[in-house]
Amino acid sequence: MALEDRCSPQSAPSPITLQMQHLHHQQQQQQQQQQQMQHLHQLQQLQQLHQQQLAAGVFHHPAMAFDAAAAAAAAAAAAAAHAHAAALQQRLSGSGSPASCSTPASSTPLTIKEEESDSVIGDMSFHNQTHTTNEEEEAEEDDDIDVDVDDTSAGGRLPPPAHQQQSTAKPSLAFSISNILSDRFGDVQKPGKSMENQASIFRPFEASRSQTATPSAFTRVDLLEFSRQQQAAAAAATAAMMLERANFLNCFNPAAYPRIHEEIVQSRLRRSAANAVIPPPMSSKMSDANPEKSALGSLCKAVSQIGQPAAPTMTQPPLSSSASSLASPPPASNASTISSTSSVATSSSSSSSGCSSAASSLNSSPSSRLGASGSGVNASSPQPQPIPPPSAVSRDSGMESSDDTRSETGSTTTEGGKNEMWPAWVYCTRYSDRPSSGPRYRRPKQPKDKTNDEKRPRTAFSSEQLARLKREFNENRYLTERRRQQLSSELGLNEAQIKIWFQNKRAKIKKSTGSKNPLALQLMAQGLYNHTTVPLTKEEEELEMRMNGQIP
C-alpha cells in the first residue's frame, strides 16, 4: 500500500513537467543574459558619448563655463560607469551556473545608469520636447500605466532603437548618476527651445536656470508712475462721487420740493460768493475742507422740517463791504451738528466780502472764527462785544422752535457787523443735534378734579417717631433698604413714608445752606441751567458774569 501511494500517478512527477520546467528555466536564464548584455552595451555607448561630450564641453553650467565642480562630477560618473561595466562582465561570466540565476529577483540587478542625450535614445519626447532622460524611459518600460499622456502628438515620437525593440523583459527603475551628482536635475535643454505646451503640468526641473528672467530694478521713475496712477484713480473716484452727489441734489425739482430747492440754491450762492472773495490759497483750502457739507446738511435739515410751517424768508440785502454778519450759530466740534446749523445759516445769512472770512470758517470753533474775523474786517475793534446775560436769552429756550432760534440769534449781532460769541445753549446737543424734533411748546396742565376726599391726608408723625427719624438722619442721611425695613417695623410706618421724610429733610437742608453742585453752577453760568430755585449769591453772580464775559 505504501508502495502504491509512493508510485501513484497523482503524486509522481511526470517527465513532461520536468522538461517544461527545465525549458522555462533556460528561457529565463537566456532572457536575463540578454538583458544584462543590453545593459552593458548601453553603458559602453553612454561612456563613449560622455567622453565625447566632455571633450566638446557640452555639459556647461547655466551661469558660467564648464567649471571644476562639473568636471569632477563627470569624472566620478565615468569612473562609476567603468566600475559598473566591470561588475556586469564578471556577473555575466558567472551567470552560467544555475545557482547564480535561481530566482528572477536576484538575477535582475538595480542598475545605476548614466544620462543619455537625444542622439542615442530619442524615442520619447518629455513634455512635448525632443530630449528625454533614461530613467523615465526605464520607468515607462517597467510600468504599463506610467505613460506620458502629454506625448500625444505624432511628430513628437520616434521609433525606438533596435536594442530596445528586442527587449521583452522589463528592467527595474534606474537612477541617473549625472542627475545625482550634478547640481541640476534633468536633461540638458536645447538652447532657444521654449515650452510649447503651456497647459500641461509644470515640471520645474525642465526650465533651465539661464532662462529665468532676472527681476528689473524698481527705479524712481516706476515709483513716480505708480503714485501718479494711484492719484489718477483717486481723482476719478472722487469725481464720480461728486457727480453722483450732484445728481442726487439736482433730483429735487422746485415744484415738488420748493423748500429743499431753496435751501440748495441759497447754499450754492453763499459758497460761490465766499469762493469769489477769498484769495486763492484760502479758497483752495476751503474747497478741500468744506466741499459739500453745507449743502448736504441743509438738505437733511430741510427734509426733517417739511411738515412744519415755513419761516418767512428774509430777502438778501445788496452786497456791501461795510456791514453784514453771519447770523447762523456755529456748529459744535462733532460733524453730526453740521446738518442742523448750516441750514440755519442758509435762510438768514447774507454773503458779502465782509463776512467771507467768517463764512470760510463755518466749520470751526467760535474762538477760531473770532480770530479770523478780527484779523479781517474787525481789525478796528479787536475785543468782541460781550454776550448779553442769560436773562436776555429766553429763560424757556427749550420751548422754542428752530425758526424762533433763527430770529433770536440774528438779533444778537450788532448793526456794525461785529461777530459775537454765541450763548452756550447754542452748543447744547439737545437743540443743535436733533433738528427733526420740531417746535417745543409748553403744554398747559389740565386742572385735576380731585376732591378733598380723594387726596391722601398728610402724614402726622408723633413726637417719638420724629425724634427717632431725626436721630437716624443725623447718623446717616441715606438709608439702606434693610435699615428702612427695620425702621418701618419699629415705628409702625410705611417704607414710602420714611423714604419721603428723608428726601424732604435732605432738600430742606440743601435749600437752607444754598450749596450747589459745581456742574449746576457751570451750567447756570452758561445759561443752560435756569432753575433758579435758590437766589444767587454774590460769588455766583460774579462767576456767572465772568463766564458770560461781562467782567474782564
UniProtKB/Swiss-Prot annotation:
Keywords: Developmental protein, DNA-binding, Homeobox, Nucleus, Phosphoprotein, Repressor, Segmentation polarity protein, Transcription, Transcription regulation
InterPro entries associated with the record: Engrailed_Homeobox_TFs, HD, HD_engrailed, HD_metazoa, Homeobox-engrailed_C-terminal, Homeobox-engrailed_CS, Homeobox_CS, Homeodomain-like_sf
Name of the featured protein: Segmentation polarity homeobox protein engrailed
GO function term, MF aspect, one: DNA-binding transcription factor activity, RNA polymerase II-specific
DNA-binding stretch(es), residue numbering of this chain: 454-513
Coiled-coil portions: none
GO term, biological process aspect, one: analia development
Record's subcellular location: Nucleus
Residue stretches of biased makeup (Basic and acidic residues): 446-457
Protein function: This protein specifies the body segmentation pattern. It is required for the development of the central nervous system. Transcriptional regulator that represses activated promoters. Wg signaling operates by inactivating the SGG repression of EN autoactivation.
Disordered: region residues: 93-112, 130-171, 309-419, 433-460
Pfam families, sorted: Engrail_1_C_sig, Homeodomain
Record organism: Drosophila melanogaster (Fruit fly)
Family membership: Belongs to the engrailed homeobox family.
Acidic residues bias spans: 135-151
